[in-house]
C-alpha cells in the first residue's frame, strides 16, 4: 500500500461513516444520520495493513491491533496505584515476542490538542518504567495469553493523520516539544484540507517529509 492509497482509504472511510450502516428495504430516503460513525477502529486496521505489507520476513513478527497489554504480576501499577498497569496502544509491533514499538493513531488533534504535549511527556516517563519488563496480552480470537518482553529501545509513536483542527504554529510548538523526548515521536502525515472535509479533497496533500520518516521507522522496527 502506498502513502496516497492510505490517505485515500482514510478519506473513503470518512465518507462511508456519514451513511447508515444498514438500509431499510423501502423508504430509504426518509433515513439520515445526523452524526458520522467513528472511524477510529478502521484507521487502526488500515494502518495495521499498511505496516503488514512492509514486512520482509514474517517469521516472528506480530502486528497487534488494539491489544490490552497487562503487567499483572509485576510491581507496575496504574496512576491510582491500586491496579496493575494496563496499556492499550492502537498498534504494537512484536518481533520474536519482544515489543519494540507502540503507535497511537489520531485522526487529528481535535479538542484534546491542548493536552497533547503533557500526554506525550507522561508516555515518555511510562516507557522508562516498562523497559525490559515482561507483560502479556490475550489474543482477540482465541483469548490465549501471550507473554512478551518490552524492548529496552521501546518507542511510542503518535501518528496524526490530518493537521486540520489546529493551527500550524501550535502544531509546530507541540512537535518541537515532543522531539525533545527520548522515547516518543510524532508524525503528521497529511497537510492542507482535513480528510473529513466537506470541501474538495484535492486540497489535501501528503506530508512527504513526515510520511517518509514514518516509513523508515516502520521498516527499522519490523525488518531491522
Sequence positions of predicted segments:
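Long, low-complexity, intrinsically disordered N-terminal extensions of eukaryotic proteins, enriched
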Residues: 1-5, 143-144, 152-161, 211-224
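Interdomain/boundary linker segments immediately adjacent to catalytic/signaling cores
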Residues: 1-75
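Charge-rich, solvent-exposed alpha-helical interaction surfaces
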Residues: 6-9, 13, 126-133, 213, ...
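Short loop/turn segments at strand-loop or loop-helix junctions that form parts
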Residues: 66-70, 103-108
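Active-site beta-strand-loop-beta-strand hairpin of nuclease catalytic cores
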Residues: 84-104
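Catalytic cores of nucleic-acid endonucleases
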Residues: 105-189
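Non-catalytic C-terminal interaction segments of nucleic acid-processing enzymes
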Residues: 163-224
